[in-house]
């Protein structure tokens, strides 16, 4: 019993110490619980902050990716436009060259036609000259023939007149007294 009594005395003496200790323990538990909650809140806040950073980084990455995609698209569009402009310029140059070539061909064709017309005019003029020469030649031949005919006629008439004169002279001679 001594032991029980001793325990009871010790317990009664230790009750305020235990009570105080229990209060301290409860406070310590509450404080530990509060620290746990604070730590949990801090961890949660850190997690939220980390998550927000990750979300912000993801947004930034997407924005950068979109900007890069937009830049690539703009570059591709600019390159496509440049290629199209180059093709249009080449097509325009080809068209201009073709038109210039066709204009040159038309000009050459017109020159050929003018030369052919001038040649034809010259040939016609020359033919007219040849015709005029031929007419003059024929006129000259006609004049020669006419002259020969006139000369022959004159000779014939002269011969006839001579014969008449000779005949008359013979007649007169025969009619004369002194024959």
From Swiss-Prot:
Q: Where are the residues of the annotated region Disordered?
A: 26-103, 136-179
Q: Where are the transmembrane segments?
A: none
Give the compositionally biased regions (Basic and acidic residues). Answer: 34-61, 82-103, 158-179
**A Pfam family that the UniProt record links to this protein:** DUF5384
- Bias (Low complexity) ranges: 63-79
| Top-level division of the source organism's lineage | Bacteria
InterPro entries given in the database record = Uncharacterised_YfgI
Which cysteine pairs are joined by S-S bonds?
A: none
> Which BP terms from GO are recorded?
DNA damage response
User: What protein name applies here?
Assistant: Uncharacterized protein YfgI
| Organism of origin | Escherichia coli (strain K12)
Q: What is the lineage of its organism?
A: Bacteria, Pseudomonadati, Pseudomonadota, Gammaproteobacteria, Enterobacterales
């Amino acid at each position: 019993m001594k032991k029980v009594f001793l325990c009871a005395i010790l317990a009664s003496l230790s009750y305020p110490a235990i009570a105080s200790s229990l209060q301290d323990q409860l406070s310590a538990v509450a404080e530990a619980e509060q620290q746990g909650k604070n730590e949990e809140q801090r961890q949660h806040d850190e997690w939220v902050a980390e998550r927000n950073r990750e979300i912000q980084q993801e947004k930034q990455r997407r924005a950068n990716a979109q900007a890069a995609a937009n830049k690539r698209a703009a570059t591709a569009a600019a390159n496509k436009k440049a290629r199209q402009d180059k093709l249009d310029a080449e097509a325009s140059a080809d068209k201009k060259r073709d038109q210039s070539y066709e204009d040159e061909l038309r000009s050459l064709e017109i020159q050929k036609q003018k030369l052919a017309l001038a040649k034809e005019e010259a040939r016609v003029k020359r033919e007219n000259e040849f015709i005029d020469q031929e007419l003059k030649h024929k006129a000259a031949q006609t004049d020669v023939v006419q002259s020969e005919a006139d000369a022959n006629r004159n000779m014939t008439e002269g011969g006839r007149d001579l014969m008449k004169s000779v005949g008359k002279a013979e007649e007169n001679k025969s009619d004369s007294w002194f024959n």
